Amino acid sequence: MCSIIGPVDIVLLCKVVDNFGDIGVVYRLARALSELLDPPDLRLVVDDLEAFRSLEPLVDAGLDYQSVRGWEVFRWRETEAAEKAFRAKPPSVVIECFACGRPDWLEALLFDAPLFDDPQISARDCLLVDLEYLTAEAYAEDFHRMPSLTRSATVHKAMFLPGFTAKTGGLILDKSFMSSRARATSLEGRLELRRELLSGALAASARALPPDAAERFWTCVFTYERDYSSIVADLAAFAEGRTMGGRPCVAPRPILVLAAAGKSQACFSSAWERAGRPFPLLELPFLPQESWDRFLLASDFSIVRGEDSWSRGALAGRPFLWQAYPQDERYQMVKVEAFLERLRPHFDASAFAPLAAAYRALNDRDRDTPATAGDESVLPLLEASSSLADGFRDFADSIISLGNLAERLVATLK
């Protein structure tokens, strides 16, 4: 990969495609980079500022240009403010997140030097970094840091792939997440975190919960649309201490389910209503990213989806299921099997078998709609959650040992 010498001015490009997953990763990366750069010389070019505002309330979705957290934030579409700023100060590094491409005005500025205010700018190199989606597939190691050509001798390009191995870029370890993770590692710290969450902005909703809400087995659900009847039934059986056949097996385990805002919330709540409200349910509003992190870290078991929450589930160090985005010809199963192979070394065979079965059942489908039922069973994982915890903790520790993706990216650029 071509290196940039001297101060690093970084531009992050983001087009919101899949709900908030894309901007979620970009926002987290921006925060992590700011923790490493002094000053945090970052410019963000985003096409959906409303989505950005949902994660970072300081963003004003009505402005084409603004300063947020010390960053310059530009709307994707061509604006006078963006062109003026980039003509006066060309970027040394442009990170294209998830193959989003470049705005037309930036494309012209990068590849048509006379457009810059300073005629000497044409001699300055620029590095385009193609930050790809997270994957556990082997190609992540093959393509990480691979250079490629552009139509300019002064504009270079290379790929940067997140991943779960030392030959990839790792995952983003932002300070806010890692600090909350450290608190949630112990049971005492997790209970303290839960009490804070329930007494904060959600205090009004939490008043309807049982008095022992913080001490219950917390399960967080954030996936795609589907019929959640079987998952609700398993959660109810676990709470009542019943086996899959309905026979008493273990002592009842009072639970609290957190239904995250998004595609899955209404579907899950509907299945819960049909089942007779068998356990307490807290419907979460859409939360700023750092608040969402804390709810996920406070949970004993999670079912997550997408990109950013998948990476946070992997780093949390507690049992979780991941639902991949459904693709044509069920290609998501290739991604799921690759991830299972990353998990496998951290579990013994007897524990891994039901875990793998649950991952496959959750993901092996052509589409997700509110009426799409599946045969997934989470009860075996819930019953084995204590024994599975060691394997997930070991897996998380192995990822953290790789280092911070943001730090590795900056080290590569300098």
Regions found by a protein language model. Name each.
Residues 9, 92-93, 127, 218, ...:
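Structural motif
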Residues 11, 15, 20, 27-31, ...:
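A donor-sugar binding/catalytic signature common to diverse glycosyltransferases
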Residues 13-154, 262:
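Active-site and donor-binding regions of nucleotide-sugar-utilizing enzymes
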Residues 132-229:
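A nucleotide-sugar donor-handling region in carbohydrate enzymes
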Residues 231-248:
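Short hydrophobic signal-anchor/transmembrane segments that target glycosyltransferases
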Residues 244-285:
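Catalytic donor nucleotide-activated moiety binding site of glycosyltransferases and closely related
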Residues 305-392:
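Catalytic binding pocket for nucleotide-activated donors in carbohydrate/polymer assembly enzymes
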Residues 398-414:
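C-terminal alpha-helical cap of glycosyltransferases
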